[in-house]
Amino acid sequence: VANLKCAFGRAEVLHGVHLEVRAGEIVSLIGANGAGKSTTLMCVSRIHRQATGTIELDGRSIVGLAPQEVVRRGLVQVPEGRRIFPRLTVRENLEMGAFTRTDRAGVAEDIDRVCGMFPILRERAGQLGGTLSGGEQQMLAIARALMSRPRLLMMDEPSMGIAPMLVAQIFRTVRDVLRAQGVTVLLVEQNANAALRMSDRAYVLETGNVALSGTGTELLRDERVRAAYLGH
């Protein structure tokens, strides 16, 4: 991503953001509310079409593509607030995640695979998504996104409104299972401490600009980051 700009009406909210996510990495965007983190993800996934700049996936531009074509190229977003289909069962939600695929046998195998990552989903397979707890819905949202076999998975605030124990479980899955499977992750997360600890690299956004970047370890030790986002 290079020189990414986005405006709503006359108000520009991203002022030339540059960031890179290399294959196999976990990269985080941290920053205060309103810094432009979620907007960055929605511009990259082409949900917001007003953005200008360079956006490439595997060296190919995705600017101008419809969101569903971006999914076919291998980029998927887990939205803030989960946004599962409340009136569909867990299994039906997972099947919806594979809407770009035609290989039924492979889809069935992947349902079994993601349920292995989050065993509670197997137990709840016939239950309506809207009846799940917040943590279970977040697991379902991540599993649904994985059903498209993404190369780049973007997650927006996965810890929001979830009990700390479940947050830890979700982060362990992202760190261990997805890394083992070679899925690249771009994470937006208010829990800066947890995000930086699991990230290879991270960017700090402030009012629509990249203010700092470095490895997760470097930013955990940075006095400016510690004072602004880690409570030290």
Describe these PLM feature segments.
Residues 1-232:
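Glycine-rich phosphate-binding loops of nucleotide-dependent enzymes
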